[in-house]
Structure formats: C-alpha cells, structure tokens
Amino acid sequence: LYQAVLGRIRAEQDDGDSRIYKISPEGKLGQLSLDHVLGGGRFGKPPLTQYLGIPEESMGLEPTIVPQKAEIGTRYLICSDGITDMLSDGEIADILTREISVSETVELLVERALIKGGRDNITVILCELVEQEKSLFGKLLNYFL
C-alpha cells in the first residue's frame, strides 16, 4: 500500500473499505485514500453496481495514487473499517498525536475500537518516518539527485 522511492512516499489503495491517513508532525490529520464502498462510489455510483452490464474484461478501477513528500515525524495509518466505523477522525487524530511509541499507538487504536463495539475485523498498520544515518550509497544518491 505504501511505496518509498528516493525520499518520497507514494500512497496507493485499491478499492475497498480501508483508509490511509497521514498525520503531520504538527498534528494535522488528512485522509489520503478515497472511500470505495456503497454510498461512497468513486463515480457517483456504488462500486459494484457501476459495472452492471459491462463485460468482465472491461471492468477495473484505478487505484488512488497520492504522491507525498516524506517528512521526518510524519505518521501514516492504514486501517480497516473496524477502526473507522468505531472511531471518529478526531479520536483517531487524538491517539496518533500522543507521545507514545508506534506499537503503543496501534494497541490503543485497537483497544478503543473494541471498547466501542468492534463489530468488524480490525486491521491497523502504522509507520512513522524517522531520521536514519545514511549509508555511503544514500549520501552518493542524494549528491546526484
């Protein structure tokens, strides 16, 4: 779902009920993905019914692609609707901005979703961009780019 290429992040998502969020080091939450579920159809129609009467080989939706500049301290959250159906964007942002580790943040997101009812599967992937000492190859690559 995420691909890091030469210091840039490219968010990709296929159709479905999962979301990708970005939270900046300043605490600003943004949804990078589009919802592709009933009622949130990409083309004004639900994703399944928009293909009624179309030959199978002609079907297909392009993934959402959102180029992102990589910034140290940014967190990226990929989560299923087991999280987003239970927690508001504000609740998600509150948890993501806490001064706790990535693993503690994931545990808290899952715990809160379960406390609020957890009716669906709960899947969470969270990454945080951190500064890392560059290898000689990395330094040379930056020199030429």
Would you name each region that the model predicts?
Residues 1-79, 83-145:
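Conserved subregion of the PPM/PP2C metallophosphatase catalytic domain
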